């Protein structure tokens, strides 16, 4: 049976997506290994996967990019964000290749899967080592298509003359701003004897043998004019209960006679807890039960102030246990959180903070399954108004339930595993 090597950073959402796909591949009888940060070794051992740790890649440097307060992680400062993006995507490619080359030689995977941001596999190794590569997009398809605006600014989809003109203008500006990224990527490719890029990195990623989008077209502007290599598999993020996390039995003590609202900033949020504070203050003493989670931060360290009786604050709770009980979820817009909520028909309020979260929020709002609340408007009063609007407007839940039905038809991890298996078998046939 084919062997699959999955690469991923140690960020929680990346790990959850990868483990879901790895489990589905293993259920089909395949061997699966992961390449990730050394600190994830125990997690993969617990799951029973072969594990190869980063050797040359500096995980601490990546943590600085993700979590250091002096880094720009949104497009508010375009030039600084471009520099951050170049560091994140490109500067570790030589170390990735140095780590992965001996694994390819010794473990001999049939397919190499990158997590969409470990880009060495599709920018270098696919052509250099003649191994089929699949790349992942966790929510938004990054391959440019006619039905979507340029990625990054959360623009409206180009459906009339005004939005089409806006999309074309921004696309031209984006090519200029990101020219340094393309030049750096071409320099790296030339150092491995490969030709320079003639397109953007995102467009080039659509040329790999398989570009998997872990979402559905219906939640991605119904894109149809994409390369044949792009396939939508549905969400693959519903595993999220490591054995070392505490039980959620305490949820049984929370009254069920009022709506349940959950607010989370995810596990990668390091800035001021604007969402949790607005929820704790704005929803206090209202006829609802509000469950706040701090991710990797203890609520007691977040300066949320005195908590009302209806506010329940904990560090973490498994979404497998919590989400089916919710009436509304408030989030900063991480891909796994958003898809997990919609998979069980829960409408959303998204306060998009950084990276791809504004793009995700725009897509959810377009679908009618939730609304956006800009971070600068995330006050207790506006949070209360947003929650009451979603609770008392049936269309939000109806659209969330509609999307849940669409998700169920795509298969998620099982579909992703099947497509990866087909890629491996096709490559084996070509070789033979």
Positions of PLM-derived features:
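Active-site-proximal region of nucleotide-activated glycan assembly enzymes
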Residues: 133-221, 227-229
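Conserved nucleotide-sugar phosphate-binding/catalytic loop shared by glycosyltransferases and other
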Residues: 34-81, 161, 166
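C-terminal amphipathic helix plus adjacent low-complexity
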Residues: 107, 380-432
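Donor-nucleotide binding loops and adjacent catalytic segments primarily
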Residues: 215-328
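A donor-sugar binding/catalytic signature common to diverse glycosyltransferases
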Residues: 20-22, 315-362
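Conserved nucleotide-sugar donor-interacting segment of glycosyltransferase catalytic cores
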Residues: 89-164, 218-220
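Conserved nucleotide-sugar donor-binding subdomain of glycosyltransferases
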Residues: 67-121, 164, 168-202, 206-207
């Amino acid at each position: 049976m084919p062997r699959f090597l999955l690469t991923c950073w140690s960020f929680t959402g990346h790990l959850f997506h990868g483990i879901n796909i790895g489990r589905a591949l293993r259920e089909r009888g395949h061997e699966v290994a992961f390449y990730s940060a050394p600190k994830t070794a125990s997690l993969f051992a617990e799951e029973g996967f072969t594990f190869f740790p980063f050797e040359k890649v500096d995980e601490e440097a990546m943590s600085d990019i993700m979590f250091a307060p002096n880094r720009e992680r949104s497009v508010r400062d375009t030039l600084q964000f471009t520099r951050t993006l170049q560091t994140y995507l490109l500067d570790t490619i030589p170390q990735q290749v140095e780590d992965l080359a001996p694994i390819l030689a010794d473990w001999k995977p049939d397919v190499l899967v990158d997590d969409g941001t470990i880009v060495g596999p599709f920018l270098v190794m696919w052509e250099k080592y003649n191994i089929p590569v699949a790349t992942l997009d966790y929510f938004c398809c990054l391959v440019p298509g006619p039905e979507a605006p340029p990625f990054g600014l959360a623009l409206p989809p180009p459906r009339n003359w005004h939005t089409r003109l806006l999309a074309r203008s921004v696309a031209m500006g984006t090519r200029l701003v990101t020219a340094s990224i393309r030049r750096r990527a071409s320099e790296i490719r030339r150092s491995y004897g490969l030709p320079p890029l003639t397109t953007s990195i995102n467009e080039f990623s659509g040329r790999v043998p398989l570009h998997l989008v872990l979402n559905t077209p219906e939640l991605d502007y119904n894109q149809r004019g994409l390369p044949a290599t792009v396939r939508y598999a549905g969400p693959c993020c519903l595993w999220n209960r490591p054995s070392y996390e505490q039980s959620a039995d305490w949820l049984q003590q929370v009254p069920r006679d009022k709506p349940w609202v959950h607010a989370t900033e995810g596990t990668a949020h390091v800035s001021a807890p604007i969402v949790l504070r607005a929820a704790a203050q704005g929803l206090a003493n209202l006829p609802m039960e509000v469950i706040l989670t701090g991710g990797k931060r203890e609520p007691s360290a977040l300066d949320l102030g005195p908590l009302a009786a209806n506010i329940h604050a904990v560090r973490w709770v498994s979404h497998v246990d919590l989400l089916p009980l919710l009436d509304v979820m408030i989030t900063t817009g991480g891909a796994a959180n958003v898809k997990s909520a919609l998979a069980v028909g829960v409408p959303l309020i998204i306060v998009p903070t950084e990276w791809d979260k504004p793009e995700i929020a725009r897509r959810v709002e377009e679908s009618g399954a939730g609304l956006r609340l800009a971070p600068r408007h995330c006050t207790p009063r506006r949070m209360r108004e947003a929650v009451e609007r979603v609770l008392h407007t049936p269309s939000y839940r109806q659209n969330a339930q509609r999307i849940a039905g669409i998700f169920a038809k795509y298969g998620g991890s099982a579909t992703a595993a099947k497509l990866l298996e087909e890629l491996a078998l096709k490559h084996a046939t070509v070789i033979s």
